[in-house]
Amino acid sequence: MTRFWIGVVSKEHVLRGVEGGFCQVCHGKKAPLNRMKKGDYLLYYSPKYQMNDQEKLQAFTAVGKILDDTAYQVEMFEDFFPFRRDVSYYQPVKDCPIEQIRQHPQWRQYASQLRYGHFEVSKDFFLYVFDQMKVDRSRNN
């Protein structure tokens, strides 16, 4: 059964993932990535442009489909070895400001979970956000 997820990541880091064809959540932890399976979908929500910046973005910034079954580890820096999953991202997409999503009936349920960094959402909510990003859903299915 296909599941739908949100990952909370700065836009700067989202763009690295889109460019490299991977996802990484919760500062590179393996456990959240292992909850996703091949064929699942991931929406990225970016509260900020850069992780340590104060400037807010508060928008959904990328959407993709998980391509593999297992997380793998990479060396980003000498002492940082995060886990990743391979993703096929839908492109082009445009950022979807959170204001456009707040009217969805399930928004309140999910808004409080953003602080966890990675969580499952309903197909209905996923498709609602997806449509707001004006993505051609026929690609990558």
Curated annotation (Swiss-Prot):
Disulfide bonds: none annotated. HAMAP family: UPF0310 (MF_00771). Belongs to the UPF0310 family. This is UPF0310 protein SGO_1818.
